[in-house]
Amino acid sequence: MKFFTALAAVGALLAPAVALPTPASEASHNQTLSVRLVRAGHTMVRAIVTNNGERPLHLLSFNTIMDENPTSKVDVSHEDGGEVEFLGMLPRYDLSDLTEDLFTRLAPKDSVEHLFDIATVHDLKWDGKYTLTARGAIPVAEDGGTDIIDHVYYESNALEMDIDARKAAMVPRAFDDYFSKGLDKRRPLDICNPMKEKALRAALQDAQKVATEAAAAAQNNTEKVFEFFRARDPGTRKEVSKRLASISGVATMDGGSVTWFCSDGPRRCSPRIIAYTFPARNEVHPCSLFWQLPHRTNECHRQDRIGTVIHEGAHNPNAVTPHCKDHGYGYNRATALSHQRAMGNADNYALFANARQLVFCLLHLFLALPFIYIFANF
């Protein structure tokens, strides 16, 4: 009897590890944090972020409207329905061992403002009316802490801006100096030293294998597809499989449709960026953290070089169209996304492809069984 009591204890431990978060309507969570977009110039925007709650918020800015890097902060559409191309970067951040300086503390009823110019990272090539919206989730830690415990959702007002394309073109874009060099000059082979080239080729080759295996699994593993993409229908399984197969196809340094660099030519790496992608150019640049990651992790849902290749591959239009964005990082956030957002989130494909790592999570807990059994006999 005590054995089954102990087994039940293990089951209780396992339940949180394998239970799926319930996807929440992001709009319905828009009461704690509000974001108001205000025009501050011809193409300048001021985002006013307000804590409407009764408790302080400890907010992590990575890949949100508060990000200081030239990232996608707002969705931009033109009145004629034409696609507004994003010209900025999509970074993958290291979320381990976060430090206090990476957070913004927002007291109850307080606001913080962020000013940015949409012309620096968007191709505003048409005259006329543009509509801007911001929607997402910001990771939150306990006040004074650095462990992510939740996310607060935000959905802004729709800001309409009449823009003169010629004036917008005069705004220096974030990466004009770099892109003006041309691909040949941007990729000096001597920068890719033998050690880095070997590591990158190994990551690409194994990412090919992992993504190919995941593409096959997506066709048949209905529950695993539901776990990561919130749908079981054949159409979803087929699309997930197709995208993973395409990601596998671009994971090569030998004449593929995505260019994998060995260096940070644009000089946009920071201490927390693992790698970043320019979707407008189908280019991926690793940072120093990429080389420090393990080739293949044996920890639950941890970042490694193989997963980073799959994640970054999903950001490139030559692999996935439309390219995936960063709606959420990590297992808990990724599996809490709605179906539509999960299908467009790069980390969901990396996590799905590496889902076999869940075995390690279960193994660690099963190893605790003897200790639980002993405890149950006291």
Curated annotation (Swiss-Prot):
Swiss-Prot/TrEMBL keywords: Cleavage on pair of basic residues, Disulfide bond, Hydrolase, Metal-binding, Metalloprotease, Protease, Secreted, Signal, Virulence, Zinc, Zymogen
SUPFAM superfamilies referenced in this protein's UniProt entry, alphabetically: Metalloproteases ('zincins'), catalytic domain
Top-level EC class as recorded in UniProt: hydrolase
Single GO molecular function: metal ion binding
Positions with a binding annotation for Zn(2+): H311, H315, D326
Main location: secreted
Name under which the protein is recorded: Neutral protease 2 homolog ARB_04336
